[in-house]
A protein has these predicted regions:
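Alpha-helical segment of the N-proximal tetratricopeptide repeat
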Residues: 70-114, 118, 124
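Structural motif corresponding to the intra-repeat A-B loop/turn of tetratricopeptide repeats
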Residues: 92-93, 126, 159, 196, ...
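Basic Arg/Gly/Lys-rich low-complexity intrinsically disordered segments
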Residues: 1-75, 271-297
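Residue-level signature for tetratricopeptide repeat
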Residues: 88, 120-122, 153-155, 192, ...
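Generic helix N-cap/helix-start motif at coil->alpha-helix transitions
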Residues: 43-44, 75-82, 108-116, 143-151, ...
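TPR-repeat structural position
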Residues: 95-96, 129, 162, 199, ...
């Protein structure tokens, strides 16, 4: 457990349309509603969530620990525990709880870049795109790290500003991005083009040699998924099925729903069993008019 996510490839960004499941927590996870949260007056703010007792703060990775050493020892330990708790909450799928932990960490150590990074990525995961954008802008100013730009651009998409997303991506030459961030930037740019009703342009952005990468990188399933989803939007169903299948082959953990999309093309549907379970638990009349009572035992 690292405590603070490292760079945008650790965050969920979206390659489809706002509201799609990219099928995009990483370019490719379920997007949120993009609502802007309202800052509460200080007296109305909820208390910080309790940190689980088993979290010591020593679980934090070296990069984060190095930055936290700029703080007084006791404060640094508290912030480390908050960041580890946030990381655990994200792993458990509770983005709102992660955001609460990182908000408290920011209150205590808002001048530390990894704290702002953690809050930005937690807000992004929670669908609070306005907060995520503000925090990641701050990280970019503090560190000069351009690898956050794809996530920032995806926040603009979440706020229904696809043109701003494209403008932001255009500010940074691909040569200034890491290999992973370059791919994430293309996925987000393609999503923005689709938002603007330009699926052909989106497809061109995604037609890169990395689609056929032999090594399984974190971004490969999301890239193939975005490509397949764009093909499907263009009505190229046979090609789309091929690429959804190729995405599923490199997505054993199911970060995307590529396997389900393949099944849909094959005419297989998945039904929620929740309603059936509820029905099974409902009390039934002792004597149903449609059922003959059995013999007494």
């Amino acid at each position: 457990m690292t405590g603070a996510p490292r760079s945008p490839e650790s965050a969920p960004s979206r390659g489809g349309k706002p509201g799609d499941k990219p099928r995009g927590g990483k370019p490719g996870d379920k997007p949120r509603d993009g609502k802007t949260r309202v800052e509460r007056p200080r007296e109305d703010r909820p208390r910080a969530p309790r940190i689980p007792d088993d979290i010591t703060g020593k679980e934090i990775d070296r990069r984060v620990a190095a930055e936290l050493r700029t703080l007084p020892e006791e404060l640094g330990l508290t912030v480390a525990r908050l960041l580890v708790a946030a990381s655990r909450a994200l792993e458990d799928g509770d983005s709102d709880l992660a955001l609460a932990y990182t908000a408290e960490a920011k209150r205590l150590a808002g001048r530390v870049s990894v704290v702002r990074e953690a809050m930005g990525l937690a807000a992004y995961s929670a669908g609070d795109f306005a907060t995520a954008l503000a925090e990641l802008r701050a990280v970019r100013r503090m560190t000069g790290d351009q690898d956050f730009v794809p996530v920032m651009a995806d926040c603009e998409r979440g706020l229904e500003r696809p043109r701003k997303a494209l403008e932001l991506l255009a500010e940074v030459p691909e040569s200034e991005l890491s290999d992973a961030a370059r791919i994430e930037a293309r996925i987000v740019a393609a999503g923005a083009r689709r938002d603007l009703g330009q699926p052909d342009a989106a497809l061109l952005l995604l037609q890169v040699p990395q689609l056929n990468a032999r090594r399984t990188e974190d971004w490969l399933a999301r890239l193939r998924y975005a490509y397949a989803d764009t093909l499907a939007e263009l009505g190229r169903d046979q090609d789309a099925r091929v690429w959804f299948e190729r995405a599923a082959q490199v997505d054993p953990d199911g970060a995307t729903d590529a396997a389900e999309r393949v099944a849909e093309f094959d005419g297989i549907t998945f039904e929620d069993s929740w309603e059936d379970e509820v029905d099974d638990q409902r009390p039934t009349d002792a004597a149903s008019p449609d059922v003959e009572p059995g013999p007494s035992v």
